[in-house]
Curated annotation (Swiss-Prot):
<dbReference type="Pfam" id="PF24553">
    <property type="entry name" value="Rv0428c_C"/>
</dbReference>
<dbReference type="GO" id="GO:0016747">
    <property type="term" value="F:acyltransferase activity, transferring groups other than amino-acyl groups"/>
</dbReference>
<dbReference type="InterPro" id="IPR000182">
    <property type="entry name" value="GNAT_dom"/>
</dbReference>
<dbReference type="InterPro" id="IPR016181">
    <property type="entry name" value="Acyl_CoA_acyltransferase"/>
</dbReference>
<protein>
    <recommendedName>
        <fullName>Uncharacterized N-acetyltransferase YobR</fullName>
        <ecNumber>2.3.1.-</ecNumber>
    </recommendedName>
</protein>
<dbReference type="InterPro" id="IPR050276">
    <property type="entry name" value="MshD_Acetyltransferase"/>
</dbReference>
<comment type="similarity">
    <text>Belongs to the acetyltransferase family.</text>
</comment>
<keyword id="KW-0808">Transferase</keyword>
<feature type="domain" description="N-acetyltransferase">
    <location>
        <begin position="102"/>
        <end position="247"/>
    </location>
</feature>
<keyword id="KW-0012">Acyltransferase</keyword>
<dbReference type="InterPro" id="IPR056935">
    <property type="entry name" value="Rv0428c-like_C"/>
</dbReference>
Length: 247
């Protein structure tokens, strides 16, 4: 359980919201509605005193956001059932996966046809290209900018090209010996050609060179292709989480 709590803590630290408010050891997080992770109650710690549900509902309602709880294997027992009884809907079941850096490097091969660009802080162009590849609304730019600015300082925002064609993007931040992967997206026309594996390899190498021994990421359970890819290159699930949203 200690390892699970650590991963959940690092995952929260690597994806910080614009607004964060403590409620005991939990965190109320809000980020203009961009990503559930940054707009949910982080609950991977002991239960707070008082009426946490009312406090959360007042917090999110005051911001005009859905009331959402992040429930993991490290959350207090009985919390998920209590929220279900209060008509909170279960959505977005995910794995937290981890791998040793050396395992990833030994299971992947460098592909020299790709070229790379790196940014310590993401430019507006990087954010726009990420949003475009993901197929998201341009209105999400501000929300992502706030998250990316607040990530731990040891981080990089990466672009990969095949010749001059933008192929993929990704981000890694290093904290407490772990590299947290996020924002990995491959352009549709380049999928199925090894680009995803190469992004993870290159970002893992960067993280390893900046003090990481292990990597972690989160992935939707229903994304079977991604779960399979991550498993082949050394990742295995350490924890599961989902969200409960007030309907």
């Amino acid at each position: 359980m200690d390892d699970i709590r650590k991963i959940e803590r690092l995952a929260a630290a690597s994806w910080p919201a614009y607004f964060q408010k403590s409620i005991g050891k939990w965190l109320l997080r809000a980020n203009f509605g961009v990503t559930k992770r940054a707009n949910s109650v982080w609950t991977s710690a002991d239960m707070p005193e008082g009426d946490f549900q009312l406090e959360a509902e007042l917090f999110y309602q005051s911001l005009g956001l859905p009331v959402c709880f992040h429930i993991s294997n490290a959350s207090p027992k009985g919390l998920d059932d209590a929220l279900a009884d209060s008509r909170y809907e279960k959505v977005d079941e995910c794995f937290q996966m981890t791998a040793l850096c050396r395992s990833i490097m030994s299971r992947t091969n460098d592909n020299s046809r790709f070229t790379y660009k790196w940014e310590q802080e993401p430019s507006s162009v990087w954010i726009d290209e990420f949003i475009q590849l993901e197929g998201f609304s341009p209105e999400r730019h501000k929300g992502y900018k706030h998250i990316f600015e607040r990530m731990p300082p040891c981080k990089t925002f990466f672009k990969m090209y095949d010749k001059e064609s933008l192929t993929a993007l990704g981000t890694v931040s290093v904290i407490d010996g772990y590299g947290g992967l996020s924002n990995i997206v491959v352009a549709e026309e380049h999928r199925g050609k090894g680009a995803g594996t190469q992004v993870i390899r290159v970002l893992t190498e960067w993280a390893k060179n900046n003090g990481a021994e292990r990597m972690f990421l989160q992935v939707m359970k229903e994304n079977l292709a991604a779960v399979s890819l991550y498993g082949k290159i050394g990742f295995s699930p350490i924890s599961e989480h989902h969200y409960r949203i007030k309907r």
